[in-house]
Each structure stands twice: as structure tokens, then as C-alpha cells.
């Protein structure tokens, strides 16, 4: 198993990163990708990845919430991080019109700039989209032929949105959202429609703790060690063997991110 989305730079992990990594290994994970969401956290993600070679890797980018910080120097500041072998994707980047912590115009400018950077450097993109599907697709589509790959992380969209993403060749990241018996039911119904070769699994830790995990953790903090539960639930709803799905999704991640 490989967790493609862990926010290990989040303050909730500030006191026990070694223990979190150890628990992930004990749970059977073979790696995790640490998400970068701004320049500072991307540098921190790279530092953490370098501390755990061949188990942790990083992304580097600017999340749409932080797009208001993007300026004429941002691409040049980001590029050295992206050229590190431990950084395997550009992102988290994309559009989030649900909250608009940055204006849509700021988000679109930062997104397009990062797509250009990914094309220039030759690394895949780690994507975010919330309530912005039409613009997201419109901005992304022209770049796809110049990118080595793309994953829409933490997918929670509709069947039409899923089909549109799959038609463009995107990988689909699925989280513990499928373990929420209230909000996750529509996503559960879509699981069988994601081809196995396009499916990736992630915790998005410390967020999105699977609601149905037993025994319930003392903390609401999600961790990579809970990825096996997500994989088993995904396999259940897809009516597939869990061990097979764990291996297939790891293979997918290694192919997309070009991991050894």
C-alpha cells in the first residue's frame, strides 16, 4: 500500500512524526507522499521526505487557498524544490470555489502557472478541485498532453465529473470519505466505476478520519496507518479482493509518481 496524500507538515503531527511513520510501516504501508500546500510547507515536506528515503516522498506547490500569495517570484522559488528527486509531483494545486480564501482569478493564475511549471520540469500534478469542475477542466485540458500524469486527489464529485476526469486520463484519489455512512454514500456508489488501473488511495491525514473505524481512536486525528481500513472498505464496495486492490493501487502510485 502507498498513501498518496499525507499532510505530515500539519501541526497536529509536530510532536510525533517518527511514531506516525513507524505505525504506517507496521500497518503494512510501503510508502507515503507528503503533501506540500505552500512554499514553506513544501520545503518542510521535502525535508521530511529526505529524512525517510525510499519510504516518504513529497509534492511541492501552492494550494488554491494560498493562491493569493502567488506572485511573480513564486515559480522561481518553487522550481528548486521541484527539481529535487524526492519531490515527485507539482501540487497541491487547482481550484476551490467552495470557500474562496483566494479569489477565483488568483486561484486560476496560480493553477495555470503551476501547470506550466509541471510541463517545464516534467513532473505529474497533484490536483485539488472543489465546486469548480468546469473551470478546472477548462484550464487543465490544454496542458495534459505536456504532462507526464495527473491525479485528482480526494475526489468527492459526481458521476459526470468522474467520467470527465477519467476521459482525460486522470488518476482518482479516494479517501476515508467512503467510510462516512452519511456523507460518503454517493462516493461509495461511484467506486465500481473507477477502473482499477486509475485508482489511488490516500488518507489525507490528519483530516478525514474514517468514521466507521473500530475501535474508535482516542483522537480525531487521522493517520497513514488507517489506510488499510480505507483499502478494505474500497475493495468491499468494489467487490474485489482487498489484498489485490492494495497491490494494484500501490503499483498505480509507483507508475504515476515514478517511484523505485
From Swiss-Prot:
GO molecular function: 3'-5'-RNA exonuclease activity; magnesium ion binding; single-stranded DNA 3'-5' DNA exonuclease activity
Pfam families, A to Z: TatD_DNase
Chief location: cytoplasm
Entry annotated with the keyword Ion transport: no
Residues given in the record as a divalent metal cation binding sites: 92, 128, 153
Leading EC class: hydrolase
Keywords of the record: Cytoplasm, Exonuclease, Hydrolase, Magnesium, Metal-binding, Nuclease
EC identifiers of the protein: 3.1.11.-, 3.1.13.-
Cofactor or coenzyme needed: Mg(2+)
GO CC term, one of those recorded: cytoplasm
Compartmental location: Cytoplasm
InterPro entries: DNase_TatD-rel_CS, Exonuc_TatD, Metal_Hydrolase, TatD-like, TatD-type_Hydrolase
PANTHER family hit by this protein: DEOXYRIBONUCLEASE TATDN1, TATD FAMILY DEOXYRIBONUCLEASE
Subunit comment: Monomer.
Role played: 3'-5' exonuclease that prefers single-stranded DNA and RNA. May play a role in the H(2)O(2)-induced DNA damage repair.
Family the entry assigns: Belongs to the metallo-dependent hydrolases superfamily. TatD-type hydrolase family. TatD subfamily.
Name by which UniProt lists this protein: 3'-5' ssDNA/RNA exonuclease TatD
Species whose genome carries this gene: Edwardsiella piscicida
High-level lineage: Bacteria, Pseudomonadati, Pseudomonadota, Gammaproteobacteria, Enterobacterales
Annotated gene: tatD
Amino acid at each position: 500500500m502507498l498513501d498518496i496524500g499525507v499532510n505530515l507538515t500539519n501541526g497536529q503531527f509536530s510532536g510525533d512524526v517518527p511514531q506516525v511513520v513507524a505505525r504506517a510501516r507496521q500497518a503494512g504501508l510501503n510508502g507515503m507522499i507528503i503533501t506540500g500546500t505552500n512554499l514553506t510547507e513544501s520545503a518542510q515536506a521535502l525535508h521530511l521526505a529526505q529524512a525517510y528515503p525510499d519510504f516518504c516522498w513529497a509534492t511541492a506547490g501552492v494550494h488554491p487557498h494560498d493562491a493569493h500569495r502567488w506572485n511573480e517570484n513564486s515559480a522561481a522559488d518553487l522550481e528548486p524544490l521541484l527539481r529535487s528527486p524526492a519531490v515527485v509531483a507539482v501540487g497541491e494545486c487547482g481550484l476551490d470555489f467552495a470557500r474562496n480564501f483566494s479569489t477565483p482569478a488568483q486561484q486560476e493564475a496560480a493553477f495555470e502557472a503551476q501547470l506550466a511549471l509541471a510541463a517545464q520540469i516534467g513532473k505529474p500534478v497533484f490536483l485539488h478541485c472543489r465546486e469548480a469542475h468546469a473551470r478546472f477542466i477548462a484550464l487543465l485540458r490544454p496542458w495534459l498532453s505536456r504532462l507526464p500524469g495527473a491525479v485528482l486527489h480526494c475526489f468527492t464529485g459526481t458521476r459526470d465529473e468522474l467520467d470527465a476526469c477519467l476521459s482525460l486520463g486522470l488518476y482518482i484519489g479516494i479517501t476515508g470519505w467512503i467510510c462516512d455512512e452519511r456523507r460518503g454514500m454517493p462516493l461509495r456508489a461511484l467506486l465500481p466505476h473507477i477502473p482499477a488501473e486509475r485508482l489511488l488511495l490516500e488518507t489525507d491525514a490528519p483530516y478525514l478520519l474514517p468514521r466507521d473505524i473500530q475501535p474508535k481512536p482516542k483522537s480525531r486525528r487521522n493517520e497513514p496507518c488507517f489506510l488499510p481500513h480505507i483499502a478494505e472498505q474500497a475493495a468491499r464496495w468494489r467487490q474485489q479482493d482487498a489484498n489485490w486492490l492494495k497491490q494494484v493501487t500501490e503499483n498505480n502510485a509507483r507508475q504515476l509518481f515514478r517511484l523505485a
